[in-house]
Swiss-Prot record:
Substrate binds at residue 414. GO terms for molecular function: ketol-acid reductoisomerase activity; magnesium ion binding. Residues 15-208 form the KARI N-terminal Rossmann domain. It comes from Serratia proteamaculans (strain 568). One of its GO terms (biological process) is L-valine biosynthetic process. The active site is at 132. Its cofactor is Mg(2+). This is Ketol-acid reductoisomerase (NADP(+)).
Amino acid sequence: MANYFNTLNLRQQLAQLGKCRFMAREEFADEAGYLKGKKVVIVGCGAQGLNQGLNMRDSGLDVAYALRKEAIDEKRPSWRKATENGFKVGTYEDLIPQADLVVNLTPDKQHTSVVRAVQPLMKDGAALGYSHGFNIVEVGEQVRKDITVVMVAPKCPGTEVREEYKRGFGVPTLIAVHPENDPKGEGMAIAKAWAAATGGHRAGVLESSFVAEVKSDLMGEQTILCGMLQAGSLLCFDKLVAEGTDPAYAEKLIQFGWETITEALKQGGITLMMDRLSNPAKLRAYALSEQLKGIMAPLFQKHMDDIISGAFSGGMMADWAEDDVKLLNWREETGKSAFENAPQFEGKISEQEYFDHGVLMVAMVKAGVELAFETMVDAGIIEESAYYESLHELPLIANTIARKRLYEMNVVISDTAEYGNYLFANAAVPLLKEFMTTLQAGDLGKSVAGTSVDNAQLRDVNEAVRNHPIESVGRKLRGYMTDMKRIAVAG
């Protein structure tokens, strides 16, 4: 199979990369109505599979789970989760032929085998759903022409999808219809109903494309969302310990610092995050972030280029064919890092101390978010999509580090995200080694000394932060998410 994106001409590529429209709430007046009375069968019962299914059932849809026969016979975790929650469970052969919508929520690397197994069983005119378009765009999966192919991609982990729904809210969501598979013109109606059934319409839905979702999702998770947090954690911990900081304190400052810092980001963007610093610290964080952007821009651009060309997906799929030898080696190396094995700090670190002693971490977040956003937009991705794949998801990923350090982050994210994370972090750490030697007292582990501030410089920095394009689009999109809750687990 050929990479679908690479079969398109330039005009088609640009059109699909640039497809992005914020949908009005009135467009979801029928909510999940289009799918009521129809049979929805979910393949896969992981975090997204289970939690989307629970939401859809609570929205009045008929939901069942199709699992492999061996998973049922051996009563594997997927079978237990589905049955313990009262869902009907059956084999592919039992359930797929009656399904009006088959939702594939298995891991990326299983998509090809799953889709090839279910396609022959699907009835004429049924629909096939994804929550990530990798199989369609990067693998180039060919789907029967009578089948409608749609995507509903919540911009949060599965657990958050469920928790927000139970609060009567939802999470921001991208929806799309594959242009090669919409024979009856009902793809958008199906996608809208599915998104509403998960609660996404209450938080904001972007009409996107499979191409835009995949290329932006890969870029975000590889760079700022996971790769930058991993590289930053390793670099900052080693720097603190090398300068005599108690390893336990250093570990806690970093483990919970990302979450505390990005909670401000979630509530008020980069502007609020920077406003949590003293004026001297803000000026220093801005200067550091500009240095970081200059150093890292080529690395961000290389990742975007490799994602657009298909070089990234080709390399990762080659590793799949070798039983994940690279992925597993990188995972083992991360587990052996000093940060992952540092003792726990029993003392208290106040919320403000995370900012005061984490000026470099604030700078890393600012630089990473802006670079990811700018690089995606330069590649033709619309600003709203770039926002969701950079700034919006960052607090959720930081929250996983607060739970069990980098191990937890890499367990929670997909194997695709984990592979890309290691690629980026393994390049970023040596790239930033020299920069780390230039840090001043007060950049990390201590507060910035001095109180002198140049008014004109502070004015210019404030204006530069607030006028960055990601802040403009962020203010608009956060307006649709006013019911957000704090996700901090607090250290």
